[in-house]
Amino acid sequence: MTDTIRLPDELGRAIQRRRQALRLSKKALAERAGKVREVVYRLEAGDDVTVSSLLAVLGALGLAMRIDEAGLPTMQEVADRFADDDD
């Protein structure tokens, strides 16, 4: 699984996809990570959590984080980001 993640909601969707692929409930993932279920809910919603909570959940999913230079977003990424805007 390799995703380019630029926004919190993209991170949330990636975590949710991985959890579902592993057939884990939010409660089961939280237990594996040693965190409360609220952490998983917040992550999947794109809300703020501590870095240590993020790393614990990623580890419980068998994932790791890698830091790369971001560069400019692609036209598709910009279009996707603003697709839901009503303006």
Annotated model-derived regions:
Residues 1-21:
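A short, Lys/Arg-rich alpha-helix, primarily the initiator
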Residues 23-41:
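Short alpha-helical DNA-recognition segment
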Residues 68-87:
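Short, charged recognition helix plus adjacent turn
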Residues 14, 25, 50-53:
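Residues that mark the N-terminal boundary/hinge immediately upstream of a DNA-recognition element
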Residues 52-68:
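DNA major-groove recognition helix of helix-turn-helix/homeodomain DNA-binding modules
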Residues 36, 47, 61:
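The DNA-recognition helices of helix-turn-helix-type DNA-binding domains
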